[in-house]
Design a protein with these regions (language model features):
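Sec-dependent N-terminal signal peptides
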Residues: 4-15
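OB-fold and OB-like single-stranded nucleic-acid-recognition modules
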Residues: 6-7, 19-155
Length: 155
């Protein structure tokens, strides 16, 4: 039974990943209202698929570089005081919330930290263009020219 379940999950993940991989290249395209076309909308996928897709993007970023990605998760940051840099990220847990993946983002325009950012753990929706950069000899990925909205909490 476990083998069947594992095989089913792998097949569904592969199908979802290949469906995303054949999206038309439209990183600079715009819809009729002038909005950037979203190449991959992770905010509409299940936790397992999102976690798998983000892992795939981090493992093999080449097909996704320059593409517009939208993702929902929760906000977190890292204040690197040694280098004077604050890194902002959209964190995505897997379906069981035991493991997390995250992608750093850089908001478009001028923003001040912490005034222009939500509290840690706030539910956010981030849309930006996936790019890579090098820092201290290591290649990292981030969403640039990003827009972030804070999702309202249900009370």
């Amino acid at each position: 039974m476990k083998k069947l379940l594992r095989t089913l999950i792998l097949c569904l993940t592969a199908a979802a990943l290949s469906a995303g991989a054949i999206c038309p290249a439209a990183a600079e395209a715009e819809d009729p209202e002038g909005q950037a076309v979203i190449d991959l909308d992770l905010s509409r996928m299940s936790g397992t698929i999102v976690y798998s897709q983000v892992y795939n993007m981090l493992y093999d970023p080449e097909p996704w570089l320059g593409r517009i990605i939208r993702m929902a998760g929760y906000y977190n940051y890292y204040d690197d005081q040694e280098h004077g840099t604050v890194y902002h990220a959209c964190i995505i847990p897997d379906a069981t919330a035991c493991c997390v993946q995250g992608i750093e983002f850089v908001l478009a325009g001028e923003h001040t930290w912490p005034e222009d950012y939500p509290e840690i753990g706030a539910d956010i929706l981030v849309t930006g263009r996936l790019e890579e950069y090098e820092e201290s000899g290591v290649i990292y990925l981030h969403l640039v020219d990003a827009e972030m909205t804070v999702e309202k909490q249900e009370e």
